[in-house]
């Protein structure tokens, strides 16, 4: 099995804080709030629900905004310091299914009802993607080193099982761009079409969209035939009902975490790196703009103001010799975007950094792949 590591990939920018419970009343149900908070108690048919998430989300601000907190051992929660807006609020947690969304505004005490999952399969739909990804079974250690496509199907460069796993998970491989184990990747959606086998379905899906050529080429690092068989076996076992192990709910200080999210780049973009301060002195740029680069998907620096919730962009100038690296045509249409060329860029930017004066620096180069 693949070892599980906790990580987050997405278009949202997350800022994480810790709350302390010092000085709070320990009476069950007593949740003091300010005028910009929402708080209350989460219960289900089994009683108070500890260690579950309460999510508040709004589209009223210039960019989509969400705040997430965790209930304490008596099911109490506090969503602090919310911008003025109307929020959809619901409960999510291991062993539950999402509760119906309730509309509320800051300054309100709001008790919520959690919904117990009817069965293990329903509960598992909310488990982290990497728990599902851990069900993927890599080639056994005895199959290494690989003997090539004409041998055991594994590349000769894969000297050990860990080399093979590394090639799947590291730079320019699957998990650099994809959250393997999420619902779309752990299933074969009907939108892909009808195929004679799961191997054929995976061979097709890895060629779709603007990066289809790159994905299918990367498959060679895993052994094309064996790689397809391994991914097909993974989704087949999940389709047959195999479930990952049950993750633990947040415990102890994990319940003090407050996550704030802004969708700051758009559904077609891929924000690769971001910076908000000088790492040598994290007091620099307090509450100031947050800067992100869109790497392969655009030629600009994306900037979020966390106070106004507004997003702006600054173009990154390419060199005079740079060419647009977007393909002229999509070989296999994307399930989501069809034949649309969603990425066009001349610059590949990485690793923005902030200096002691709040200036942003980044590495960059001309896009390396040129399509005539």
Task: Identify what each model region corresponds to.
Residues 58-64, 86, 90-107:
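A short, solvent-exposed loop/turn motif at the edges and junctions
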Residues 205, 247-262, 311-334:
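Beta-propeller fold detector
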Residues 36-38, 44-60, 64, 84, ...:
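Short, ordered, surface-exposed loop/turn motifs in non-cytosolic proteins
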Residues 48-49, 78-86, 94:
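Short Pro-Gly-centered beta-turn/loop motif in secreted/extracellular proteins
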């Amino acid at each position: 099995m693949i070892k599980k590591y906790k990580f987050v990939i997405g278009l949202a920018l997350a800022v994480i804080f810790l709350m302390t419970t010092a000085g709070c009343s320990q009476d069950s149900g007593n949740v003091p709030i300010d005028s910009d908070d929402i708080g209350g108690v989460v219960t289900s048919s089994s009683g108070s629900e500890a260690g579950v998430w309460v999510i508040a989300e709004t589209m009223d601000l210039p960019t989509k905004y969400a705040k997430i907190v965790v209930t304490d051992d008596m099911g109490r929660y506090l969503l602090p310091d919310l911008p003025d807006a109307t929020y959809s609020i619901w409960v999510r947690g291991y062993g539950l299914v999402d509760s119906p969304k309730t509309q509320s505004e800051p300054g309100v005490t709001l008790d919520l009802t959690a919904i117990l999952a009817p069965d293990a399969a329903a509960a598992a739909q909310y488990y982290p993607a990497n728990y599902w990804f851990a069900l993927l079974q890599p080639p056994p250690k005895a199959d290494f080193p690989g003997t090539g496509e004409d041998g055991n199907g594994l590349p000769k460069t894969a000297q050990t099982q860990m080399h093979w796993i590394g090639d799947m998970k590291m730079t320019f491989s699957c998990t650099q761009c994809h959250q393997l184990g999420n619902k779309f990747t752990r299933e074969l959606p009907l939108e892909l079409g009808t195929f004679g086998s799961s191997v054929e379905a995976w061979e097709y899906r890895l060629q779709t969209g603007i990066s289809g050529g790159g994905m299918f080429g990367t498959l060679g690092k895993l052994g094309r035939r064996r790689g397809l068989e391994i991914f097909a076996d993974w989704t087949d076992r999940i389709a047959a009902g195999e479930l990952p192990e049950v993750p633990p709910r947040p415990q102890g200080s994990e319940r003090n975490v407050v996550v704030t999210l802004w969708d700051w780049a758009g559904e077609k973009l891929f924000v690769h790196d971001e910076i908000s301060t000088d790492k040598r002195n994290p007091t620099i740029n307090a509450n100031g703009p947050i800067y992100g680069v869109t790497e392969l998907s655009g030629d600009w620096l994306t900037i979020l103001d966390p106070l106004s919730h507004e997003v702006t962009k600054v173009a990154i100038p390419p060199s005079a010799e740079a060419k647009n690296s977007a393909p002229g045509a999509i070989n296999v249409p994307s399930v989501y975007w069809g034949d649309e060329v969603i990425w066009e860029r001349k610059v590949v930017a990485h690793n923005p950094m902030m200096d002691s004066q709040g200036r942003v620096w980044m590495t960059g180069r001309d896009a390396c792949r040129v399509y005539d």
